[in-house]
């Protein structure tokens, strides 16, 4: 799995441009620009409920390979209208993924070279779904 420094591009949710996140978005974009890091706004991410793109977007495992985990967090199970339009985003971007049935928020994964650190929330999610 690639570390954050090895990924191709940073995508930022459009919802970050709205108050109360706008100053954070400005600081982030300025920092990326100053470091010559390629970035773009993520299509279909205007909702303030879709700002955590790292949670629902695929994980990049090598230059051309992405794994999409099942984004079905416990805190959104009763609010399907808050789930992001990930399939539409990926289609628009032309990203092909390997789908996984594992229920994992991408934000709960940290890549450390050839190792991955994950939170134990994956076990709670599996039990909650009866898997």
Where are these regions (language model features)?
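The feature marks the mature, well-folded catalytic cores of soluble enzymes
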Residues: 1-131
